[in-house]
A protein has these predicted regions:
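C-terminal amphipathic alpha-helical interaction region
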Residues: 459-461, 468-472, 503
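Domain-level recognition of nuclease-like catalytic cores that cleave nucleotide substrates
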Residues: 502, 506-530
Length: 530
């Protein structure tokens, strides 16, 4: 099987004999039931391929769709004028880049259709004029497809890049790009009667930055149950298209076919984009894993978006204060250019996803989607938060290996050494509430990374919960941590709260570990096992 890794052109996939997961039934539904759409999905999730497929569909290239669902659904196969703008691949941190790109696109289209341009008009006005001209000349309404509509904004989000406009005014490029896009998108309102179909894709839905205020509000299908699987790969699609490839991967890795399916699911599945909660696999990582026949962090290795790194560096919110909570959609769907509210950007960038839906309150539980994101994203955050030379993921590997050998002494030494390596400037907290917050967040980061290697939970008991319970094939480890307390206090709590009771019938030995953490030294100062 040939995997279309890095190929986003539908025609190239078909002509090259690459595997294609058929999404054309959803595309047909989209083009027959609506007119102007917006779709938000994380990077490398198939948005560009979706746009490309629509381009060839509206181009009337029926032969490319032989054997696909849409071949039987579509009867007409009409050809429409298609205007495709792809903002991928351009750097919009320079003041003139966006305007120049739009000017070049419109000028090329004017030449293509034999229309004389008018430099006195804005680029949005010229585009609206062009759409009307092409509609009248061809007798066909126009199709506009814009891929990564928000990249000119994300490139300069939360920066102070500046430029001088034509009137000599000194402007932030973020503001300039926003105004330029607003003016360009206003063409859609002026040309409504000339439009057959419009799709804008991107990572982020900008709410109060006025990008969409200039034209008819698009139908946002980002959380639509009908379109939740329009990008990405479902479990049914994985089994139906890649069954033999998963078996071959299992053979290569020396595990059973069922084990390889569980590995793929834990590492790349877990995305949900609607209240229906259909499991969606990350397509980029999944295809890479099947091609290479190995489990690696393919999506995360392509890099965390710079805009998200900037945003996180400027916020005081810790991830443990954002995850595991129920939210109204207004809290995580619309980004309002507020660095104090990073949740929408983290969610829309693919680092958090929907894990549950509460119908009574119409709210959504958000958390990390899968092990790839847990390990990569939390390691990145831990590096910035703790400032250690050794990564938190390296520590997690050491802790995992120690517990699998039932070696608590090495476990303690590794954890103690890691805490000792945290610079004083990173852990210095003056207020008691700050000390508590630092203590809880540090352990949250370490143990959630550890959970990608071992069965690790914060077990809810009727009497309360242990700080952490780790299960290995040969043992159960119940940890209780105290800040500026004693290890005896921690062990006493384990007994009094009955944290070990669920394991009374377990054949594995149960280890109770009390740990005291010193806010003064920033490391472990008392440790006892029972």
């Amino acid at each position: 099987m040939k995997y279309p890794i890095g190929i986003q052109d539908f025609k190239s996939i078909v002509d090259g004999g690459f595997v294609y997961v058929d999404k054309t039934a959803l595309l047909h539904k989209m083009v027959t039931e609506g007119k102007i759409y917006f779709l938000s999905r994380p990077r490398r999730f198939g948005k560009s391929l979706l746009v490309s497929t629509l381009k060839y569909y509206f181009g009337g290239e029926r032969e490319l769709f032989r054997g696909l669902a849409i071949e039987d659904l579509e009867q007409e196969w009409e050809q429409y004028p298609v205007f495709h703008i792809d903002f991928n691949g351009s750097d919009f941190t320079q003041g003139s880049t966006l305007q120049n790109k739009l000017d070049v696109c419109v000028e090329d289209w004017e030449r293509q259709y034999g229309m004389t341009g008018d430099d006195r008009l804005s680029v949005g006005e010229r585009f609206a004029r062009l759409l009307a001209f092409v509609h009248k000349r061809t007798g066909k309404q126009c199709v506009v497809l814009i891929d990564e509509y928000d990249k000119p904004l994300l490139d300069v989000l939360d920066t102070d890049y500046r430029t001088t406009d034509g009137n000599g005014n000194n402007l932030r490029i973020e503001e300039l790009n926003r105004n330029t896009l607003k003016g360009f998108y206003s063409a859609f309102k002026a040309a409504d009667q000339d439009l057959r179909f419009v799709l804008l894709t991107g990572v982020t839905k900008f709410s109060q930055v006025s990008v969409f205020s200039g034209f008819n509000q698009p139908e946002d299908i980002s959380m639509s149950a009908a379109y939740e699987a329009v990008c990405g790969i479902t479990e049914a699609e994985l089994e139906g298209t890649f069954h033999d490839e998963m078996d071959a991967m299992a053979y290569e890795m020396g595990v059973s076919p069922e084990e390889v399916r569980q590995l793929l699911k834990r590492h790349y599945d877990g995305y949900h984009f609607s209240k229906r909660k259909t499991d969606i696999f990350n397509p980029f990582s999944l295809l890479n894993a099947l091609s290479v026949k190995d489990i690696q962090d393919y999506w995360f290795r392509t890099g965390t978006p710079s805009y998200l790194v900037r945003l996180l560096s400027h916020t005081d919110e810790n991830l443990n204060e954002l995850t595991g909570k129920y939210y109204d959609t207004s809290d995580f769907i619309d980004y309002r250019a507020d660095v104090e509210r990073p949740l929408p950007m983290i969610y829309q960038s693919g680092y958090l996803t929907i894990k549950d839906y509460d119908r009574f309150s119409n709210s959504y539980l958000l958390d990390l989607p899968n092990n790839e994101v847990k390990k990569g994203f939390l390691t990145l955050i831990a590096s910035n938060y703790l400032g250690t030379k050794e990564s938190a993921n390296t520590l997690a590997i050491q802790l995992t290996r120690a517990l699998l050998r039932d070696d608590l002494d090495t476990w303690r030494k590794s954890l103690t050494a890691f805490f000792a390596s945290i610079p004083y400037s990173m852990r210095r907290k003056d207020m008691e509430t700050e000390k508590e917050r630092y203590f809880h967040y540090t352990f949250y980061l370490i143990f959630r990374i550890l959970s990608t290697y071992l069965v690790l939970t914060e077990k809810q008991q009727s009497e309360g919960r242990a700080d952490c319970i780790v299960e290995t094939p040969t043992g159960v480890y119940i940890f209780e941590f105290k800040l500026d307390g004693t290890a005896d206090d921690a062990l006493r709590q384990i007994e009094e709260k009955g944290y070990a009771r669920p394991y009374e019938a377990d054949s594995r030995p149960v280890h109770r570990v009390g740990v005291s953490f010193s806010s003064r030294t920033g490391t472990i100062d008392d440790w006892k096992e029972a």
